[in-house]
Swiss-Prot record:
Enzyme class, spelled out: hydrolase
Pathway(s) where this gene product acts: Nitrogen metabolism; (S)-allantoin degradation; allantoate from (S)-allantoin: step 1/1
Residues annotated with N6-carboxylysine modification: K195
Top-rank taxon, per record: Eukaryota
Species name: Oryza sativa subsp. japonica (Rice)
Catalyzed reaction equations: (S)-allantoin + H2O = allantoate + H(+)
Chain sites annotated for binding Zn(2+) 2: K195, H231, H294
E.C. numbers: 3.5.2.5
Protein name, UniProt field: Probable allantoinase
Subunit structure: Homotetramer.
Alphabetized GO MF terms: allantoinase activity; cobalt ion binding; zinc ion binding
One example of a Gene Ontology biological process annotation: allantoin catabolic process
Length: 507
């Protein structure tokens, strides 16, 4: 009888001990020896990760995700504690597990201008920000990526430097726009689509295109069913009275704002009316797709794009976190870190951008990470008219979007759509952009409630931390882990030592 009583007491104690061990395993997923010489901070290529908030199958809830051989092998939705014995298991508690971000608009500046950023620092910053795939723009590197030969130079420059996966856009410029064989050579070499400017780009070997160049380029793109990304600003034929006065202070942000009014975006999109119509079913370039990058004007320009979509044109639109986080009224005079093109507009416009994003009229988000060497930002001089335009942002886009989107009621599912699912569709990235069986295990784990201050002590992995407009800001949403192809490439402010991201080429 005594033995039976003792046994009755021991079994519950063993159960408690097992539960405690499980809790310890789950709440402390990484050992102090986190690290290694290879591609991953974890020593396994087959493991489970779990949390109370997994974004998958259009829902957010408890689930465990099996990662095997770089892919998502299975998902167990519901009470995942039963998977404790399927070792190794990493439980992130109530942190969010969602698809890694896909940033379709980043300038990594290599080859030729690695002093601005470069593949190594840019992709390390991306990994620290939960971005698992970047698509690099064809300009700001030198030479610009406008031919098969210049794409090869970029691929050579990227070798052994990629901490996340990287695809490449090619350039549509006057020298190749009217030459189908030249464009086909570039597309056959593997660029995911093309990019053009309707105004001067600021880069000498990347000249602007006109509507004829765009319309002819779309005919070639239609054969490949790849997109044309367009910087939609054009100097109107007749400037209105709101243009800048030569006597205005170049340090005043209002001076720069007046120098690139919404009329520039409106003029460009009006010029694209015929090109957009050509993408409709039965149109001259049916199968092609126009993507408007970094939309800033949430009024007339957005209205024109909404009309084109409703009429059947294949058009998509992105905006960027800096247009959603900042407003013209908040930009300090002389603080050229905030200069970008198109410019950050007023707070009413910012609210309208959020509304359009929530309503689906803006399809997705991108960083438009566009750094430079610090001296080009003219931060001491503070001249907005002469400083390089571009926001340095790769590491911060997820917390910035979440921090400013909370007051507009954004959801985790919307975040995954804007930053993962829709960008994957634009770039033709199959088996990316979702946490689903058979998809590449590109995953970010983050804590939305965790707040942090981007002060001088916060680790920043961009090449030049001092040029970012986000420094000094209080943000919510700490990145805990980033997995690329099943490799844990970033966790606990550590990067995997080897750069094992892959170049992505269209087939």
């Amino acid at each position: 009888m005594a033995m039976a009583a003792a046994k009755g007491r021991v079994l519950p104690l063993l159960a408690v001990a097992a539960a405690l061990a499980a809790a310890l395993l789950y709440r402390a997923p990484f050992s102090k020896s986190l690290g290694g010489e290879g591609c991953s901070l974890l020593p396994h290529d087959h493991f489970w990760i779990a949390s109370e908030r997994v974004v998958t199958l259009g829902r957010v809830g408890p689930a465990a995700v099996e990662v095997k051989g770089g892919l998502i092998n299975a998902i167990a939705v519901g009470d995942y504690r039963s998977f404790l014995l399927r070792r190794p298991v990493v439980d992130y508690g109530d942190a969010v597990i969602m698809p890694g971000l896909i940033d379709v608009h980043a300038h990594l500046d290599e080859p030729g201008r690695a002093e601005w950023e470069g593949f190594s620092t840019g992709t390390r910053a991306a990994a620290a920000g939960g971005i698992t795939t970047l698509v690099d723009m064809p300009l700001n590197s030198y030479p610009s990526t406008v031919s098969e030969e210049t794409l090869k130079l970029k691929l050579d420059a990227a070798k052994d430097k990629l901490h996340v996966d990287v695809g490449f856009w090619g350039g549509l410029v006057p020298e190749n726009a009217l030459n189908p064989s030249a464009l086909e050579s570039l597309l056959n070499a593997g660029v995911l689509g093309l990019k053009s400017f309707m105004c001067p780009s600021g880069i000498n070997d990347f000249p602007m295109t006109n509507s004829t160049h765009i319309e002819e380029g779309l005919v070639t793109l239609a054969k490949y069913k790849r997109p044309l990304l367009i910087h939609a600003e054009r100097i109107p034929d007749v400037q209105n009275e709101d243009g800048i006065d030569g006597e205005l202070d170049p340090k005043a942000y209002t001076t720069y704002l007046k120098s690139r009014p919404p009329a520039w975006e409106e003029a460009a999109i009006k010029d694209l009316q015929r090109a957009m119509k050509d993408t409709e079913i039965g149109g001259r370039s049916e199968g092609a797709h126009i993507h408007i990058v970094h939309l800033s004007d949430a009024k007339t320009s957005l209205g024109l794009l909404k009309d084109a979509k409703q009429n059947g044109a294949r058009v998509s639109v992105e905006t960027c976190p800096h247009y959603l986080a900042f407003s013209a009224e908040e930009v300090p005079d002389g603080d050229t870190r905030f200069k970008c093109a198109p410019p950050i507009r007023d707070s009413t416009n910012r609210d309208n951008l959020w509304e359009a994003l929530l309503d689906g009229h803006i399809d997705m988000l991108s960083s438009d990470h566009s750094p430079s060497a610090p001296d080009l930002k003219l931060m001491e001089e503070g001249n907005f008219l002469r400083a390089w335009g571009g926001i340095s942002s790769l590491q911060f886009v997820l917390p910035v979007t979440w921090s400013h989107g909370k007051k507009y009621g954004i959801s985790l599912n919307q975040l995954a759509s804007w930053w993962s699912e829709r960008p994957a569709m634009l770039a033709g990235l199959k088996k990316k952009g979702a946490v689903l069986p058979g998809y590449r295990a590109d995953i970010v784990v983050w804590k939305p409630e965790a707040q942090f201050h981007l002060d001088d002590s916060h680790p920043v992995y961009h090449k030049h931390r001092n040029i970012s407009a986000y420094l000094g800001k209080q943000l919510s949403g700490k990145i805990l882990s980033t997995f690329v192809g099943g490799n844990l490439v970033f966790a606990e402010d550590k990067h995997a030592k080897a750069a094992c991201g892959a170049p992505i080429l269209a087939k």
